[in-house]
């Protein structure tokens, strides 16, 4: 079985006999019910392949679709002039690159369809080209724009951001003036910018990003997983000595969990899934493929906010449109694929957002922790794995020593301007939020969503042990231990056959590390 990793060309996949998950019934629905539309999906989720599929369809390449669902639906197979704009592969942090890229496309089209006046704006030139095409062919044009937002994302939080936005706004205004010459328009990207920015120059495209009809347009559903990939699932199960059903559960926890609408149809990350099958191994493929620069920039502006974003209900207006505000990172984090919809409250029209799966949870929290604590990401990741091993083996003293050393190694400047009591409490709570959530990737974690000032409590469960922690700021370990008993945190585990240990930890605001700890077997 051949997996098309990195291949975004529909014709190459079909002609090369690579695995193709048939989405053409959704493609047919899209092109027959919509004229101008926009789709937001995370990076490496199949947007470019979708654009390539539409390109082949509108060029009437019927032979490529033999045996696919659309072959039974489409009867006419008309050929349309297709204008494909791909902003991938260009660095838009340098002034002039966006204008040069658009000029490249316009010049090539003018070679085919005829010259247009150079003194008019780029958007008007494109409109003239579309008019010429209609006059010459008698057919309306198809425009496909892949990664429409990359010129803005590349320049996020720089002076060039506004300049690139204005250029795109003027260029995309073409679609309003040239409406009579257009058969179909699709813009894909990661982020939907607010309606007053890029899209304000032309008729609003239909946003299908959260349309339940197109939840599975990109990615792999559970039904598709079992239909197309039974063989590689069996291979993985054999390697890890799992049953096939157990292996499916592992894949679901690691790569599934995306939901793109109120229908809550689960979608697997296709990039990670294909890599796992190709390598016959479970790794963090999507996250390892790179962290977008724009996300790193957002994290620099938002530290303590991150623990407030997950596991909460939101009105869709709070995460659908990005307003280029680094102080409000939720839309960018959601649309980039680091958070996803987990539940839908239809009565109040609210969505619960959280991490989609273990790969993203581990990778995102590690990245945030490295950005906050300042060590390298691999150092955070290695420490977490070592700490989990100690907990799994019941080595509580070694774990507390490792925790003390980790906190002591955090550079002083990473504490920022922690000079007030409020800032110290915030640093204390956020520090342990990150550490506990990372441990929770490997252990079962129960942590209070709302913590009292100056304390954090949680329960970590492994196969053989249950640990009840109370972290106290500028208190004593004995007081923390007493808090565990007073609150009755161990009561649910009275009949548990695992060893239950209460651990009280005191955190010093002066040294910014563990001052003392005490433990008690319950």
Name the predicted role of every residue range.
Residues 1-423, 439-442:
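Phosphate-binding site recognition
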Residues 133-137, 439-463:
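Active-site metal-binding core of divalent-cation-utilizing nuclease and nuclease-like domains
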Residues 142, 465-467, 501:
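Structural motif
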Residues 162-168, 473-490:
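Mg2+/Mn2+-dependent nuclease catalytic core
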Residues 425-428:
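Charge-enriched interaction surfaces
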Residues 432, 456-473, 487:
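Conserved catalytic cores of phosphodiester-cleaving nucleases, focusing on short active-site segments
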């Amino acid at each position: 079985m051949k997996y098309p990793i990195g291949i975004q060309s529909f014709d190459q996949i079909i002609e090369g006999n690579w695995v193709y998950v048939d989405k053409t019934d959704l493609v047919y629905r899209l092109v027959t019910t919509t004229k101008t539309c926009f789709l937001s999906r995370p990076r490496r989720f199949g947007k470019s392949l979708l654009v390539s599929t539409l390109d082949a369809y509108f060029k009437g390449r019927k032979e490529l679709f033999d045996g696919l669902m659309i072959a039974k639906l489409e009867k006419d197979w008309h050929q349309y002039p297709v204008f494909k704009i791909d902003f991938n592969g260009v660095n838009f942090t340098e002034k002039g690159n966006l204008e040069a890229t658009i000029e490249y496309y316009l010049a090539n089209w003018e070679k085919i369809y005829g010259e247009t006046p150079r003194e008019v704006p780029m958007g008007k030139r494109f409109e003239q080209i579309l008019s010429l095409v209609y006059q010459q062919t008698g057919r309306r044009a198809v425009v496909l724009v892949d990664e429409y937002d990359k010129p803005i994302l590349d320049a996020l939080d720089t002076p060039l951001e506004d300049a690139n936005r204005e250029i795109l706004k003027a260029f995309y205004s073409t679609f309003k003036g040239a409406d009579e010459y257009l058969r179909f328009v699709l813009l894909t990207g990661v982020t939907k910018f607010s309606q007053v920015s890029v899209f304000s120059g032309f008729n609003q495209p239909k946003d299908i990003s959260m349309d339940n009809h197109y939840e599975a347009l990109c990615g792999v559903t559970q039904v598709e997983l079992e239909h197309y990939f039974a063989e590689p699932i069996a291979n993985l199960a054999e390697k890890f000595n799992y049953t096939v059903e157990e292996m499916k559960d592992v894949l679901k926890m690691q790569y599934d969990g995306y939901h793109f609408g109120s229908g809550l149809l689960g979608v697997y990350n296709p990039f990670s899934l294909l890599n796992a099958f190709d390598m016959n191994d479970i790794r963090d493929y999507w996250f390892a493929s790179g962290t977008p620069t724009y996300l790193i920039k957002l994290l620099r502006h938002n530290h303590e906010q991150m623990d407030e974003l997950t596991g909460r209900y939101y009105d869709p207006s709070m995460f659908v449109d990005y307003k280029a505000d680094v102080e409000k990172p939720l839309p960018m984090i959601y649309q980039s694929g680091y958070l996803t919809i987990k539940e839908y409250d239809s009565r109040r029209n609210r969505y619960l957002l959280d991490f989609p799966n273990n790969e993203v949870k581990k990778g995102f929290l590690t990245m945030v922790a490295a950005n906050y604590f300042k060590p390298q990401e691999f150092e955070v990741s290695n420490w977490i794995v070592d700490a989990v091993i100690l907990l799994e083996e019941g080595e509580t003293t070694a774990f507390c020593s490792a925790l003390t050393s980790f906190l002591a190694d955090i550079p002083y400047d990473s504490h920022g301007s922690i000079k007030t009591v409020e800032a110290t409490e915030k640093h204390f709570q956020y520090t342990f939020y990150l550490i506990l959530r990372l441990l929770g990737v490997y252990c079962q974690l129960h942590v209070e969503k709302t913590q009292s000032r100056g304390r954090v409590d949680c329960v970590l469960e492994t196969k053989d042990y249950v640990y009840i922690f109370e972290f106290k700021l500028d208190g004593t370990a004995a007081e923390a231990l007493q808090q565990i008993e007073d609150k009755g945190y161990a009561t649910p585990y009275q009949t548990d056959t695992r060893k239950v240990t209460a651990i009280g930890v005191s955190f010093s605001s002066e040294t910014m590390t563990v001052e003392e700890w005490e433990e008690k077997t319950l």
